[in-house]
């Protein structure tokens, strides 16, 4: 009985560690999407499937200034 409880406890601890580290890795990959997209002209960015996707037009401010 002690062996099965110890095995179960080790299994639960390892599964919690794996789940925690996988979440941390996902946030690190997409942590700076808005900064990366803003570096080439301010656009919004979203993390999709672990990759940073930039949306919007970078020349929108120039067109607005020309319009006025």
UniProtKB/Swiss-Prot annotation:
Keywords in alphabetical order: Amidation, Disulfide bond, Ion channel impairing toxin, Knottin, Potassium channel impairing toxin, Secreted, Signal, Toxin, Voltage-gated potassium channel impairing toxin
Disulphide bonds in the chain: 30-38, 33-54, 37-47, 42-52
Superkingdom of origin organism: Eukaryota
Keyword Secreted: yes
GO molecular function, one term: toxin activity
TM annotation in the entry: none
Tissue expression notes: Expressed by the venom gland.
Places the protein is found: Secreted
First-listed, main subcellular location of the protein, grouped into a coarse class: secreted
Propeptide: 57-68
Cellular component per GO, a single term: extracellular region
Signal peptide: 1-26
SUPFAM superfamilies, per database record: Scorpion toxin-like (SSF57095)
Positions of post-translational Tyrosine amide modification: 55
InterPro entries reported in the protein's UniProt record: Scorpion_toxin-like_sf (IPR036574)
Keyword Secreted: yes
Additional remarks: Negative results: does not block voltage-gated potassium channel rKv1.1/KCNA1, rKv1.5/KCNA5, and rKv1.6/KCNA6.
Family: Belongs to the short scorpion toxin superfamily. Potassium channel inhibitor family. Epsilon-KTx 01 subfamily.
Entry function: Potassium channel blocker. At 3 uM, this toxin blocks voltage-gated potassium channels rKv1.2/KCNA2 (5%), hKv1.3/KCNA3 (10%),rKv1.4/KCNA4 (20%), Kv11/hERG (24%), and Shaker-IR (27%).
Description of its domains: The presence of a 'disulfide through disulfide knot' structurally defines this protein as a knottin.
Entry protein name: Potassium channel toxin epsilon-KTx 1.2
Organism: Tityus serrulatus (Brazilian scorpion)
